[in-house]
């Protein structure tokens, strides 16, 4: 009996003995499953025109930023490039594809992908150098010789407005040159007129002589096509009027 009682007392420490009165093992299992209430998830409806336009604008904006000159790419790749560059020499920029990925594997299809560089230097940015002071050119890495060479080119407005110099001698010299050109043109025109006049006088005499010669030829040539000139009807012939018996017949 003692052993049974001890066994029963020892068995009272099991999981079922700790349950409240009126609850069973099945109730505990159900409560464990339904500990968090089930929430019905919403079902997305069809996309509207406004949502579609916003999505398209967002995608286009991202492409525009990536294709712009101020896009530096992924910052993690730039940091890795700076950490890996142990020497102070400048290494070539990393070239990425459209998805900003560079797995290091060269493929034949890579030549059809759009490439972009990260870590662009200051020379590649379209800065307006006129807005920066000259003291910052050395820090920005701008070559002064190159800048001076570019500044030598004239602007497009100079072609129409001139060089902007207010020198009267330049205007006078231009007027003098224009007058000389006008005089040369007048002299050339008068010389050409006199030469043409002399040539026309000689030409008129030649024309008159040619006309006289042509008239004589016409008079001589008028009877060339006169058939009556070469036709003889026999009226002027004396054959058959008188017969001379002493004359022999001519064959």
UniProtKB/Swiss-Prot annotation:
The keyword Protein transport does not apply. It is found in: Nucleus. GO terms for biological process: termination of RNA polymerase III transcription; transcription by RNA polymerase III; transcription initiation at RNA polymerase III promoter; tRNA transcription by RNA polymerase III. One of its GO terms (molecular function) is DNA binding. Keywords: DNA-binding, DNA-directed RNA polymerase, Nucleotidyltransferase, Nucleus, Phosphoprotein, Transcription, Transferase. Transmembrane segments: none annotated. Residues 203-225, 234-251 have a biased composition (Acidic residues). GO terms for cellular component: nucleoplasm; nucleus; RNA polymerase III complex. Residues 186-251 are annotated as: Disordered. It comes from the Eukaryota. Component of the RNA polymerase III (Pol III) complex consisting of 17 subunits. DNA-dependent RNA polymerase catalyzes the transcription of DNA into RNA using the four ribonucleoside triphosphates as substrates. Specific peripheric component of RNA polymerase III which synthesizes small RNAs, such as 5S rRNA and tRNAs. C31 is involved in the formation of the initiation complex. PANTHER family: DNA-DIRECTED RNA POLYMERASE III, DNA-DIRECTED RNA POLYMERASE III SUBUNIT. Belongs to the eukaryotic RPC7 RNA polymerase subunit family. This is DNA-directed RNA polymerase III subunit RPC7.
């Amino acid at each position: 009996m003692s052993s049974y009682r001890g066994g029963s007392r020892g068995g009272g420490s099991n999981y079922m003995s700790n349950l409240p009165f009126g609850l069973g093992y099945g109730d505990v299992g159900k409560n464990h499953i339904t500990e968090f209430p089930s929430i019905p998830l919403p079902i997305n409806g069809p996309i509207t025109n406004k949502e579609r336009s916003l999505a398209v604008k967002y995608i286009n904006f991202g492409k525009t930023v990536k294709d712009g000159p101020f896009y530096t790419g992924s910052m993690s790749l730039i940091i890795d490039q700076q950490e890996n560059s142990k020497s102070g020499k400048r290494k070539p920029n990393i070239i990425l594809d459209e998805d900003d990925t560079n797995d290091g594997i060269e493929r034949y299809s890579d030549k059809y992908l759009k490439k972009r560089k990260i870590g662009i230097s200051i020379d590649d940015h379209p800065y307006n150098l006129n807005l920066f002071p000259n003291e910052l050119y050395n820090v920005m890495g701008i070559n002064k010789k190159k800048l001076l060479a570019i500044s030598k080119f004239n602007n497009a407005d100079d072609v129409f407005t001139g060089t902007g110099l207010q020198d009267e001698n330049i205007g006078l010299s231009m007027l003098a040159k224009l007058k000389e050109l006008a005089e040369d043109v007048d002299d050339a025109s008068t010389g050409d007129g006199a030469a043409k006049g002399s040539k026309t006088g000689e030409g008129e005499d030649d024309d008159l002589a040619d006309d006289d010669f042509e008239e004589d030829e016409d008079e001589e040539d008028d009877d060339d096509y006169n058939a009556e000139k070469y036709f003889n009807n026999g009226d002027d012939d004396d054959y058959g009027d008188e017969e001379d018996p002493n004359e022999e017949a001519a064959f």
